[in-house]
């Protein structure tokens, strides 16, 4: 029996030695450009065939256990239009296991993303990817795999959205046709706790095709099943600088979103801010041509079509001001009210 134990001990010892040698060799192998290029080619060939469209990864650089770097990533949609193009994508891994993955930071540089709704169906051009990864088994309990992320950084990225069912607006910010150039974004302090998702928007600046220039945007963001809340908000636009302790909206039932202007309740606490009416005109085209600089503070609350204002302090030029509490009329038909500067 002792002899058998010794033989087994030696056998397992040799086995683990070879396993260790294999792991070391694999660690060196996976670092070679030849092996990583092979992985990239296999991955792109696989998804090109699965999705029946063009997929390409120019370069893969993997540092075992803590870093994945991709270069020249390209995905076309089923109409052969460019869906995603990324010059470089870096994933810094903090830790992982069988049921969890924690990413310390995701860094995307010089990317281009174009998302659009088809005419006349309204189907999104990325739907084929969503369908591919959707589970066909709706009866089984999903695995409890958790993905955590500490920080996202976007550098010099372009984001475009189009709904081709709706014609483009001639002036103003068109939410159905958005094209953001030179997007720079930093998001950190992610929390994902059940229905609550929260994060810190540390920096966001970009310029839209309409001419609206977001020179800076910072806020603490919280999203749950009853609404959205931004605290410690700072916004700098073309000629406006806005400070707000809170910008939030809430609803009791998701069905309220179908009648957004009448059933979703806002609460906006604006601290002393400087707003140019030309910037407001991006959101309210009827005010196009106005360029007065307004000093403003106060709390705006209630539904969009029946806003109320408390502690309003509005100042224009040197001697014109308005202070008080206001109950605004229904602006559901803005064109019915003549705006003049």
Predicted regions and their residues:
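A short, amphipathic edge element
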Residues: 51-58
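Amphipathic hydrophobic-ligand
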Residues: 79-91, 166-184, 211-220, 226, ...
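Repeated loop/turn-to-beta-strand initiation elements of outer-membrane beta-barrel proteins
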Residues: 227-230, 305-309
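Flexible beta-edge/linker motif
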Residues: 32, 59-123, 127, 131-165, ...
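N-terminal type II signal-anchor transmembrane helix
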Residues: 1-50
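Outer-membrane beta-barrel translocator/channel fold
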Residues: 276-277
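Transmembrane beta-strands of outer-membrane beta-barrel proteins
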Residues: 231-233, 269, 310-313, 325
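Structural motif
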Residues: 64-65, 224, 303
